[in-house]
UniProtKB/Swiss-Prot annotation:
Keywords: GTP-binding, Hydrolase, Metal-binding, Nucleotide-binding, Riboflavin biosynthesis, Zinc. Residues 1-180 are annotated as: DHBP synthase-like. Residues 181-378 are annotated as: GTP cyclohydrolase II. This is GTP cyclohydrolase-2. Zn(2+) binds at C234, C245, C247. Pfam families: DHBP_synthase, GTP_cyclohydro2. GTP binds at R229, I230, H231, S232, E233, Q250, E273, G274, R275, T295, T330, K335. InterPro entries: DHBP_synth_RibB-like_a/b_dom, DHBP_synthase_RibB, GTP_cyclohydro_II, RibA, RibA-like_sf. The keyword Metal-binding applies. The active site is at D307, R309. Catalyzes the conversion of GTP to 2,5-diamino-6-ribosylamino-4(3H)-pyrimidinone 5'-phosphate (DARP), formate and pyrophosphate. NCBIfam families: PRK00393.1, ribA. One of its GO terms (molecular function) is zinc ion binding.
Length: 378
């Protein structure tokens, strides 16, 4: 990572790899028109990776997200050269947004504050690299394409990087580097927790950037395959038994399955309310759903991506508990994909609940628009 950091410090781009994807990236503070031209010639759309805090501070959330978590903007000029775009990006990340045209050809992407330790994505790794090199936490990157216009795989990317003298790093390299030098969860206390319906657990309390989080642990979890549920906080579903979602039923089923197994972990993720938008915003989304929006479009209408959750903190808690091989209770493929990047061996265990008339549109939207693995009986 030191070689990669040194390269970007000198204002030169590097290559990042993530399984079957690759991208060229550079800290936003040193992007130039020449680099943008190079990206436009060899890559797909240009992305500007910013934290959610930066997006709010710059007022960019007033524009609608497109394609999930992207906001397309440009400088408000008649004709826009690559150098003018580069200058616009540099001024934007320094806090001087100026006049903004929407939509545009620079795609702002929301990244997590704690980088790859919170979400192991290309955008987060690029921002982490910028931080590591001493720049502001923002980066410009673009997915590499083949000469034929297809997505560049690893072999093509490695050859391309060699031809253009670009150092290469992988997301897992950044994760390993940061885990060795940083710790974002702290185990504070452990106590016995007898429950009314699910037997007795060990309640392990952690301090994290998302707040205080509890992991309910049953049996030896530092060996063999371990049943794991990473459950997103849902006051309305878990406590008030709302029919709008299936969250409460999923939590109950998971705890029952762990109790029957006699071994497992349930992590209750604070800060995940409303897929990360918070309780009041979730209620606002409910109101929009009453007016005809689905659960995904309601979040977008409020100025949020469809899903702001990430699972890096849960991954660090599982590491602290010495869990290595996971049978993950989930219907969310994103959760599986993210946790695998932290080195866990994972097999999915479906968690099925019976839909009702009220939550059926919600579940269908999650399946159709977010790719959740939900089966409906005819």
């Amino acid at each position: 990572m030191e070689e990669v950091s040194s390269h970007v410090k000198s204002g030169k781009p590097v290559m990042i790899l993530d399984s079957e994807k690759s991208a060229i990236c550079i800290p936003a503070e040193v992007v130039s028109g020449e680099i943008l031209n190079f990206m436009m010639k060899n890559c797909d759309e240009i992305r500007l990776a910013l934290t959610w805090k930066q997006i709010l501070n710059l007022g960019l959330n007033r524009f609608r997200f497109q394609n999930g978590n992207l906001i397309p903007i440009d400088p408000n000029l008649e004709k826009i050269s690559a150098e003018e775009r580069a200058k616009f990006i540099r001024e934007l990340v320094s806090g001087n947004a100026g006049d903004i045209k929407y939509p545009g050809r620079i795609f702002v992407e929301e990244t997590k504050e704690m980088g790859v330790l919170e979400r192991p994505g290309i955008a987060e790794a690029c921002v982490d690299l910028a931080r590591m090199a001493g720049f502001a936490p923002s980066a410009v990157y673009a997915p590499l394409m083949t000469a034929e216009g297809g997505v560049a795989g690893e072999d093509y990317a490695l050859k391309f990087a060699k031809e253009h003298s670009m150092p290469v790093f992988r997301i897992k390299d950044m994760i390993e580097f940061r885990i060795k030098s940083e710790k974002i969860v702290e185990r504070v206390i452990e106590a016995t927790l007898p429950t009314k319906f699910y037997g007795t657990f060990r309640a392990v309390g952690y301090k994290t950037p998302l707040g205080e989080i509890v992991a309910l642990v049953k049996g030896r979890v530092d060996e063999g395959d371990v049943l794991v549920r990473i459950h997103s906080e849902c006051l309305t579903g878990d406590v008030f038994h709302s029919l709008r979602c299936d969250c409460g039923d999923q939590l109950e089923n998971a705890l029952k399955m762990i109790d029957r197994e006699g071994k497992g972990v349930a992590i209750y993720m604070r800060g995940h309310e409303g897929r990360g938008i918070g309780l009041i915003n979730k209620l606002m989304a409910y109101k929009l759903q009453e007016e005809g929006k689905d659960t995904v479009d309601a979040n977008i209408e409020l100025g949020f991506p469809p899903d702001m959750r990430s699972y890096g903190i849960a991954a660090q808690i599982l590491m602290d508990l010495k869990v290595k091989s996971i049978r993950l209770l989930t219907n969310n493929p994103l959760k599986i994909e993210e946790l695998k990047k932290y080195g866990f061996k994972i097999v999915r265990e479906p968690i099925e609940v019976e839909p009702c008339e009220v939550n059926l549109p919600y579940l269908k939207a999650k399946k159709d628009k977010m790719g959740h693995l939900i089966c409906f009986n005819d």
